[in-house]
Amino acid sequence: MRITYPSIDKLLDEVDSRYSLSVLAAKRAGELEAGKPGALDNYHNLKPVGQALEEIAAGKVTIDADPHGEADE
């Protein structure tokens, strides 16, 4: 399988590494499959992984640097 939309270059503009991209896409795809609402009005892809990648490319889904919400002192 080959990703054609969104392009890997566009995705890597939003996320700092391919590893981070794959983890973020997998987690978001899991949320979409579990029934969480999509962040976009229209999708080009029918499958949750493709939809997650579209959301990442659009800047709607990002990595939370501090998932526990603790401020650095």
UniProtKB/Swiss-Prot annotation:
Similarity annotation: Belongs to the RNA polymerase subunit omega family.
GO CC annotation, single: DNA-directed RNA polymerase complex
InterPro entries per UniProt: DNA-dir_RNA_pol_omega (IPR003716), Pol_omega/Rpo6/RPB6 (IPR006110), RPB6/omega-like_sf (IPR036161)
Gene Ontology MF term list: DNA binding; DNA-directed RNA polymerase activity
This enzyme's EC code(s): 2.7.7.6
Domain of life where this protein originates: Bacteria
Quaternary structure (record): The RNAP catalytic core consists of 2 alpha, 1 beta, 1 beta' and 1 omega subunit. When a sigma factor is associated with the core the holoenzyme is formed, which can initiate transcription.
GO biological process: DNA-templated transcription
Protein's UniProt name: DNA-directed RNA polymerase subunit omega
Record's catalysed reaction(s): RNA(n) + a ribonucleoside 5'-triphosphate = RNA(n+1) + diphosphate
Xref: Pfam families: RNA_pol_Rpb6
Function: Promotes RNA polymerase assembly. Latches the N- and C-terminal regions of the beta' subunit thereby facilitating its interaction with the beta and alpha subunits.
UniProt keyword terms in alphabetical order: DNA-directed RNA polymerase, Nucleotidyltransferase, Transcription, Transferase
